[in-house]
Amino acid sequence: MVRPGDRRPMITDHAIVVLADGGARALTHQAVDRHAGLPAGSTSYYFRTRAALIAAVVERIRVHSRTAFDNAQAQSAGPVTAEGAAALIAGQLRNLTGERWDQALAVFALLGEVREQPELRDALMRCLFSVDLA
């Protein structure tokens, strides 16, 4: 049984899969409840609006992206070389098209949803590429 304190991350993880499987139009509170096997109304209890759910999904993906990049960067300690940078980028792409594939699909599904919301749009774009860290 999932403890209530653990539900927000679990719900956002299921929302990511709903987005990956069905696109932005598939993302509803009911769809996330069904996918997560939660009682009806559970997702809307934690995220009252679709906008709140989308913001939570963007934040969840952002945290995963940042953690994955930080871990990869830590493994390639030492001076930055062209070969090292290429290996880091290749590793990130393998990660994004492998274990984080659902997150990548969710990012692209949400781009249209957040086009008029600069903060969320920028956060989504930073999940794919950070100019500051390039």
Describe these PLM feature segments.
Residues 1-7:
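Short, Lys/Arg-enriched anionic-surface-contact patches
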Residues 7-10, 14-56:
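Helix-turn-helix
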Residues 9, 13, 51, 55, ...:
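Generic detection of well-ordered alpha-helical segments
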Residues 10, 14-22, 67-71, 75, ...:
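Solvent-exposed, amphipathic alpha-helical segments
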Residues 56-59, 67-104:
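Hydrophobic alpha-helical connector segments
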Residues 86-133:
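Short secondary-structure transition hinges
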